[in-house]
Amino acid sequence: MTGHTPAGNNTANIIKRNEMTLIKSISGIRGTIGGRVGNTLNPLDIVKFTSAYATFIRRTSKVASNKIVVGRDARISGPMVRKVVCGTLMGMGFDVVDIGLATTPTTEIAVTMEGACGGIIITASHNPRMWNALKLLNEKGEFLNKEEGNE
């Protein structure tokens, strides 16, 4: 058949197109869900970044609380990412306040209302649907600054 692309090649092209390199910035860690470790936002990367954040919060937070607030948007990957994030935080001894579906401002406010030592927002905002992100908050419900994020 003329013009036919073998399924293997087509699948490889789709995967390559959908596997975007992780983006680490002041607003968090963003990437496409799945794919190779270190290149995308897959469960192992989520555990790695969540545990690094938890270690940072434990070392730097001025709040006596052991609570971390977790909120997420309605992306299809949200429940999976939430389970990995919450499980990692609980495994590290934190009390997770899972507020479920919530906007970024709602999650930011929940951090201060709960007297939490930090928060994680699971959202990729304006990025395409195959993306997701971990947006990291301090005890004031503010995004980590560049210096904090680099730690």
Each language-model region and where it sits:
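Alpha-helical scaffold segments in soluble metabolic enzymes
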Residues: 48, 52-55, 106-109, 151
